[in-house]
Amino acid sequence: MKIKKIPWLGHFDDRGHRLSIFSIHIHPDGSRIATGGLDGTIRIWSTEAINRENENENENEDLPKQLCCMSTHTGTVTSVRFSPNGQYLASGSDDRVVIIWHKEEAIPGLGSTFGSGEKHTENWRSYRRLLGHDNDIQDLCWSYDSQLVVSVGLDSSIIVWNGTTFERLKRIEAHQSHVKGITFDPAGKYFATESDDRTIKVWRVSDFSIEKTITGPFNNSPLSTYFRRPSWSPDGKHIAAPNAMNGPVSCVSIIERGTWTSEINLIGHEGPVEVTAFNPKLFRDKNDKLVCILACGGQDRSLSIWSSALPRPLLSCQNVFQKSIGDVCWSPDGLSLFLCSYDGNVLVCTFEKEEFGDMVSDEEISKALAKYGHGRHGIVLPESAKQLELEETAYAILKKPSSLSTTDPTLVPQSSSTPKSAQKTPQKLPAFLPNRLTAETVDTNKLTASKEQIASPKRPGPSDNGNEIPTKFVQKVTITKEGKKRVAPQLLTTLSATPSTSRLASTQLQHTGSSQLPPQQFSQPINSLPKGGVPILIVGNKTKVNHENDESDQALQEEKIEEGLLKNYYSSLIDSSTSISNINFEAPRYKTNIVHSLNNEQKYVLEVKNGTSEKNPTRIVALENGNTKWMDYLPRPVILVTGSIHFWSIACDDGSLHLYSLTGSRLLPPIMIESKASFLHCNNAYLLCISSSGMVYAWNVVNKTALFTANSLAPILSRVSNNVTIENNSTDIPHVVIASISKEGVPSVTLSTGETYVYSSTMLCWQRITEPWWAIGSREWDSSGLLQSNTQTESQPLKIYEHRTNNVLMDSGRGKLLQKMVADAITEEGYDDFETIVTINHLENKIASARLLKLDDEFLVTSEVYVRLLMHHGLWQKLEEFLGELRTQTKCSIKLSGREVVAKMLVVLRQAVQTDNEFDRANKLIEKYAST
């Protein structure tokens, strides 16, 4: 074995210092590796240059080392993973975005990047941006057939994405803490996730439901690891789980498939192990048994390599890095091991073929996986009695064609544009269904085309008997007012019943995995607005004339006239006093079942089974610790559910709100609003409801009082209507991203523009609390993207609002662009004090907002920063004005009077003095205000 560090391989800052590398992965063909680091970049390196390091330098001068550098992420890159088919590279970051990269074969590298000396010999472009996580992304993993990619993160969620279309299939929120690792079963049946809640959860790929929760090996495991990256053995038998405990000793737990028990612990590290990686190859030892090789690395900066045939490690290297090991990966041939560390170095270990034993062929690996159903398309051998029950249930459902139809067709409209031929096309069954089922019993709207159909689509043509009569096309002829005859053009081609081949599908590597999974329908309630917000329609906004079937000159003239009048038309569209019907939110989709837990705990759960009429009413069941506490029936379907420690609230599709106590008593008669509820949120004793027409309601349910008269969102949503053009149309109108109510009863709304508004019940108007302007211009803006604890989020709402703005800027990709524009602007003449002025204004706005919202902690903290800033910049008049205003107020906050706040500010002044001039001026202020 040889171990070497590559001096030129790393992520460096402007001064040449190494930056932490958090992830490393190798391409399936072994030609390149990818690294992701603290600088927010992904770098592609040539493995040929790495392998030739320390050889004749003259021969390697022209050999490219770094192939490409991608810097689209706005935060630290925590995970990089090539797809097994080699087409894509997936990267995750603490900017909460997953980016799918695709190598452009037809386009060469772009050479040097402007402003840097880095050369690019390959061109990797951002192919998809996957949004859905609410916090840092910690790990990614592809299924072995490249049909799925799963991301996990610090928001405790697991998101499953389609590996071809990259649409989100399902979001799973079963873990109770940060999810820090993910691995896929090579047989394609399961994937496993590891979390700081000290569990590993095994999930079925067929329906994304949980197979087993494993807790035993992780009791008292430390929560200090940055990652918990497990690995699945290539024969499918075992999972290597890092950060496990064997009594007081840290270890790696080996979990056996099927029983999901852990009888083997690998002990050899002094600190917690963060990452494990099985060699993708199997080896045969002297006793003719198949052997797996496992590499482990962690916080003790040591590397250990284990063989399943030996009780002790094959290799144990201590202090190979100066900091913890972040990621480990094996080359496809199983003879090279790559490690990266937080100290910014990459270690390469190369082995000889005989060191691990005789390497077995890929066919033998497939045979080892065959007993778990790998490679079987028609039928999969069941691994448990529960799977047999699921198959029998699926068979019973598919025997009833009507059972796959929508419960209420009036609530969920079906697409009318699907060709009849497409509806009748037989579809191949999913791999997890029994082989005895026929394709004719499956509703093609519920299942996607099989992999074979996608890989080789057929164009529509004549039938097999050759007697099909072609359809006669009839062109539409219209006569205008001027007597001119207009003939509408007719499309001669027809739509194919089979989806057309995409550029990506045509180049896919062939795998023996299951067919493409259909999008999943979730059973959880829509208790928050979607990440991208809900569509908003201002009544009367006609931004484009639809003249698909009318090509008359009059229609074209009307379009030109409308384009000229459009700007003035929007400026007077909405008045600030407008209430109903100016805004139209999309109502939540109908759900057959809704389950909502109180405060995300399973102790109190409300389950809703929706009906369709009075003959089939909606059933509501409240559970406490799994036992039925109370039950009720409603004649209308339920669309939203929320709850607090004081009450449950249920919204029906007829615009009614039903309020129950936790014991099931009705607190009030049903509250009627003017339209369906689009959003429902509660906090403590307060309930917030936003209707589909944009009306905002808020009540104190305990006191049974309204906080204010129903108010419209129109004033804050119509601000940019003057900027709407025919080209931009309604998609540029701002929409609501997040809405909530604080524990003090203050409603807040965050728009897609990054602005957050709160409604003041004393001023009776919407007030803007945060906006992107402060984020890009103020030095005191919190752009860390982290909230330290739940207690902090409860006591610092303004901090939450600023994080919302950060999230919107990062999701839209505008953050870096705006910061660069500001950085360029302040270098020009006349902008010397730009950042100082904007920072002072930001702090003043934050102080006023804290007083408005009665936030004592944030008011005091921001006031202290404000006082220090004014003193250091010599703005003594502003400082004296601020102290004088505080002194005159009898009640400056909930807990403190104005004089008490002034006393605290004087202490801050005394501590912040640095120069003699500041000392003299500060003493005068202290003497003036300390005596009053």
Swiss-Prot record:
Main location per the UniProt record: cytoplasm
Region (Disordered): 405-470, 498-520
Keywords, ordered alphabetically: Chromatin regulator, Cytoplasm, Nucleus, Repeat, Repressor, Transcription, Transcription regulation, WD repeat
GO biological process terms held by the UniProt record: chromatin organization; chromatin remodeling; regulation of DNA-templated transcription; transcription elongation-coupled chromatin remodeling
Compositional bias ranges of the Polar residues kind: 405-426, 441-453
Mapped WD repeat ranges: 16-55, 72-111, 132-171, 174-213, 222-265, 268-316, 320-361
Compartments reported by the entry: Cytoplasm; Nucleus
Protein name as catalogued: Protein hir1
